Amino acid sequence: MDIRNKIELFSDGACKGNPGLGGWGVLIKNSKNLNELKGTQQQTTNNRMELIAVIEGLKSIQENSHIEITTDSMYVKNGINQWIDNWKNNGWKTAAKKPVKNKDLWQELDDLVQNYSIKWVWVKGHSGHPGNERADQLANEAIAEFYDKNNTLNI
């Protein structure tokens, strides 16, 4: 892939309580631009925030792009690369015959990834990786901004 056309997407999710108030953050960069996205959801989980971060990031990128997605979530990376085909073949049930959690988001992500050429990269969270650290900051900023806007305390 031509380095000038490379798009890097760094995603992260955070949750204050699990479930609780969640935030997601995305850093997208190529050779010319840098874009940051963030958002929140109430009464959610860290895994939902991890999935939503990737989904929202992909939605902001032109289809047919070549993207390197870096996440610290093995749940997201393994889910989309190893588990999802079995889930679909088993009627959205796990190997233990239980319903797949976050099915709605997995289905949305599965539809989205068909429109891109994606390389998935896992990094250890809070290990100093600049893109991952910034995505983490964005997710936590989103939560802090929600608390500020709604005059609530982060307890």
Summary of predicted features, one role per range:
Residues 1-52, 56-66, 137-148, 152-155:
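RNase H-like nuclease fold core
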Residues 9-21, 55-134, 138, 143:
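RNase H catalytic domain
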